Regions:
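Surface-exposed ligand/attachment interfaces on beta-rich extracellular proteins
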Residues: 139-141
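Compositionally biased, low-complexity/repeat regions
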Residues: 147, 162-215
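A glycine- and small-residue-enriched flexible loop/hinge signal that marks low-structured segments
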Residues: 1-136, 145, 152, 157-170
Length: 215
């Protein structure tokens, strides 16, 4: 079927130029669409998914599941890019579950937003650093690479996309002899809201709301 993993074999293909190896290659049209999609992401940032890869469809799922479990229901909700509004009857409050990865333990990659953010940072820096390929290795080149990464990450930090970061030059003489520069970028993704609590308190129409303001 068109939705199977074999569809790409029989679908339309196009011939493109592989600039890195000076050759022509035949690829699926979906790869062209993916490249364009990545270009939009790099230029505009990640858009909000309208309905997810499953078009928002969740079948035979219950709502009594815990974030981070390995159940089929949890996978369906995450795959469909759906957020859940949950009512906790015992505590009498609502909370809004945002999308999470299926990791059981808390980590930097616990939230889908953090994962997409880090992927976007990696793709953007790769595109920016491509301009320095084939330039002579020198102190000026190292400084230019460092400045490019730092300027971009400073923007990410001021925009609250990361909590903090550190950049280290780990290039050795052996690396230089192999025509390589090595840098280590350590970053802490920003915190993403995973639950938003809302308590609905119903009062009489004659209630004096100034009492709440004084609390």
């Amino acid at each position: 079927g068109a939705d199977s993993y074999l569809a790409a074999i029989y679908g339309p293909h196009v011939t493109v130029t592989d600039l890195y190896n000076s050759r022509k290659v035949v690829i699926g049209a979906d790869s062209i669409a993916t490249k364009q999609w990545l270009s939009v992401i790099n230029d505009e940032g990640f858009p909000y998914a309208a309905a997810g890869p499953r078009l928002g469809t969740v079948r035979n799922a219950t709502v009594d599941w815990k974030i981070g479990d390995e159940s089929n229901e949890a996978r369906q909700f995450n795959d469909a890019s759906m957020n859940m509004l949950v009512y906790e009857a015992r505590q009498k409050y609502y909370y809004f579950n945002t999308q999470n990865t299926l990791q059981l333990a808390n980590s930097a990659f616990r939230n889908i937003g953090a994962v997409l953010n880090v992927l976007n940072i990696k793709e953007t820096l790769a595109r920016k650093l491509k301009d320095y390929i084939q330039l002579p290795i020198s102190d000026d080149l190292v400084e230019a690479v460092t400045r490019t990464i730092s300027d971009y990450m400073d923007g990410c930090k001021s925009g609250n996309r990361v909590s903090d970061y550190a950049l280290n030059n780990e290039t050795t003489k052996t690396d230089v002899s192999n025509n390589e520069l090595h840098f280590m970028l350590t970053l802490a993704p920003a915190y993403y809201a995973q639950k938003i609590y809302l308590v609905v308190n119903v009062v009489n129409a004659a209630f004096d709301f100034q009492i709440l303001q004084s609390l």
